[in-house]
From Swiss-Prot:
<feature type="topological domain" description="Extracellular">
    <location>
        <begin position="25"/>
        <end position="151"/>
    </location>
</feature>
<feature type="transmembrane region" description="Helical">
    <location>
        <begin position="152"/>
        <end position="172"/>
    </location>
</feature>
<feature type="glycosylation site" description="N-linked (GlcNAc...) asparagine">
    <location>
        <position position="114"/>
    </location>
</feature>
<feature type="compositionally biased region" description="Low complexity">
    <location>
        <begin position="99"/>
        <end position="124"/>
    </location>
</feature>
<feature type="glycosylation site" description="N-linked (GlcNAc...) asparagine">
    <location>
        <position position="36"/>
    </location>
</feature>
<feature type="topological domain" description="Cytoplasmic">
    <location>
        <begin position="173"/>
        <end position="194"/>
    </location>
</feature>
<feature type="signal peptide">
    <location>
        <begin position="1"/>
        <end position="24"/>
    </location>
</feature>
<feature type="glycosylation site" description="N-linked (GlcNAc...) asparagine">
    <location>
        <position position="76"/>
    </location>
</feature>
<comment type="function">
    <text>Implicated in oncotic cell death, characterized by cell swelling, organelle swelling, vacuolization and increased membrane permeability.</text>
</comment>
<keyword id="KW-0325">Glycoprotein</keyword>
<dbReference type="InterPro" id="IPR007947">
    <property type="entry name" value="CD164_MGC24"/>
</dbReference>
<dbReference type="Pfam" id="PF05283">
    <property type="entry name" value="MGC-24"/>
</dbReference>
<feature type="glycosylation site" description="N-linked (GlcNAc...) asparagine">
    <location>
        <position position="51"/>
    </location>
</feature>
<keyword id="KW-0732">Signal</keyword>
<feature type="glycosylation site" description="N-linked (GlcNAc...) asparagine">
    <location>
        <position position="59"/>
    </location>
</feature>
<keyword id="KW-0597">Phosphoprotein</keyword>
<comment type="similarity">
    <text>Belongs to the CD164 family.</text>
</comment>
Amino acid sequence: MALCARAALLLGALQVLALPGAVAQETYAQGSPSGNHSVPLLTANVNVTENTTMQVVSNQTSQISTVKPSSVLPKNVTAATVRPATIKVSTPGVSPHVTPSASKSTPKTSASPNSTQTSASMTTTAHSSLLTSVTVSATTHPTKGKGSKFDAGSFVGGIVLTLGVLSILYIGCKMYYSRRGIRYRSIDEHDAII
């Protein structure tokens, strides 16, 4: 689960790092920072063991697209889906640092009891005085295991171990009582009361 959250945050961070440069190039090309710009998204290979759904919210374009990267995934994961929706870009803020924050919430009542929703929000500022805010939320659905299965080797091993310990205890008790036991002496004729 933590691996999926890290993968989602890493993919979101890669997109955040690519967005300011792309927005700055579009702004300088068209001359207006308030116009509608199309921002290309990064595609990356994701190696996770659970289903991950990421949503990137953006108000810059009204077009919603789905990117399914072709990647090497384990057999129990089908794909990672990235849906960009809105990105807020404003020019007044200038800051040379990145502020990441992550929060983890419990699943809603409509979700399955094993699903976990993780959301992260990251704000960064590029050198061109553009403020970019991207919100990434990931939902993981762990696959069900095969459950417990009878292991004959462990069963036989447990029986052998138990019998071995019992036999050692039995032999130890026999030796202890044989050394400590009552010593009988033979009755001689002169000691016998007749």
